[in-house]
Amino acid sequence: MPSRLTPHKSPKEQVSWHHRFTMSEIATADIPDMRVSDVELKMPSSSPSYTSLTLQQLSESGYSSQELFFIIGSDAFSEIEQWHNYPNLIEQSHFVVISRSGLSNVEVRKKIPSLSGRMRTISATKDQIADLDRTTKSLSIWLIETKTRNVSSSDVRELLYKNQSTDGLLPAAVRSYISKHHLYSDRPHTTVLP
């Protein structure tokens, strides 16, 4: 689900929601049972896209908190206590925390000891991930330890700005879409620090 207006970025720093939605559809086209949600497009445009408001909108659309799994990197999750509407936010869905290079899930437990009792560690096997929704009746925070590349979306955008290879980082069809629509060819009007 592409964010309509990320709270920590200005509109000038973001490619349009329509393009991000289309790229998400292209990237997930071959994944069975996965679809990209447009719920954020339907939300009021006057406020930033806070996760808690999006999860509330999904709840009002008929999804129970037990059916929702918010997938997030360990680096972003480690800052969850600073997010809008915390701690209520973590009562709105399960959280699936994927380890990122430089911040293991063991370190996440240490950074947020108040949530440690709700955290469950599993390996990134297909069977364990498929069983997430059947292993507990309460909302959980699933820590998935896996090997990920040490690359961020900012790093990928930087490669695109420099017209460098993104092989292995972006599906070829997404890179083709980016080229066709001349996305990420100019830097946003912000200062980029080294």
Model-predicted segments: where are they?
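Nucleotidyltransferase catalytic core that binds NTPs
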Residues: 1-194
